[in-house]
Amino acid sequence: MLTRRPLLAAPLLLPAAAHAQKRPARPAKKEVPPVGIPATTPLGPIDTMAKYALVMDYNTGAVMLDKEGSTSMPPSSMTKLMTAYIVYSHLKTGRMSLMQELPVSERAWRMQGSKMFVPLNGSVRVEDLIRGVIVQSGNDACIVLAEAIAGSEEGFVELMNGKARELGLTNSYFRNSTGWPDPAQRMTCRDIATLARRLITDFPEYYKYDAEKTYKYGGIEQQNRNPLVQKGIADGLKTGHTDEGGYGLVASASRAGRRVIVVVNGLNTMHQRAEESERLLEWSYREFENVNLFNAGDTIEQARVWLGTAPRVALVGGQDVWITMPRSWRRTAKITVMFPEPVTAPVTRGDVLGKLVLSGQGVPTTEVPLLAGADVPRLGLPGRAAAVVSRFVTGS
């Protein structure tokens, strides 16, 4: 029989730790899917003049706004996030060092567009080149790094496309390391947000460069091109602009322990880019919150066990579960625990026995697995016989 038990009602939607009993032992580790509001579901009533836009919660991966977020578009200099990712990977694995000097080829020196102004036939430290890429959006710095890592920019592009596949960026394809206009070079807002999230997660030690407001190299001081970094609203990542793609930006900010990633593209002016990205960021903090449903090991419910050495088994959380939700959902959301009852022994700690369901009017249904919190061996033959007789006599 399937048991459904309401766990809490909308006005009381609080972190579920208040409703759960903590067990001293955690369940056996099982693969549990990540939890968040389905990414295709629009969560809030807001529009934007950006042709493409996506707003993502960094912690849960929930998408609060999706406007053509999966539509292919020119990424412009937001491409440089992938260049940075590969450079950081080489630093983290010891294949490159921050103090290492890299040679400047004529091709790098001649590169057009935004520049760091690397010296022809000279050499530049890797750390300076990183700042040149992130702060100054230097196309020349990208070429120096690409040639040092892969021997040529063409070889580096192969690494970029391979890394895109590895990271699950299913709608990204690169032809260069800089974002220089090329009709075949494409990304989506979703892929850019995913890449930004991975950059911050995988390389927190290098994310600090994004927050630098100015950088001076070769006697030339340049401002960080990210307007939200300049205003102290965001702490990274990257702007972009081409004639085809318009003005774009991927930015991230953290407030009170909650980080948000905003991607916009296809705007007409730098002012629109700054205004829209700031407006969407403020909206995401004003209208949404992260709620802790339960933590790994919390007991959510108890299920009766048939033919087991214990009469009940705890249904526990397999991981810490947070969801991103509009603040208005507190009035309509409800949580229900669903599980078959009785559960037939034997039960192994970590078995998936049920699920917690978040639902309600205007609330996308979200399901979270619940696991067995303990082993419950099967009774021996005499015990099973006694249980069958008892059930026949008492009907329970």
PLM features per residue range, with description:
Residues 16-20:
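Sec/Tat signal peptide C-region and signal peptidase I cleavage site
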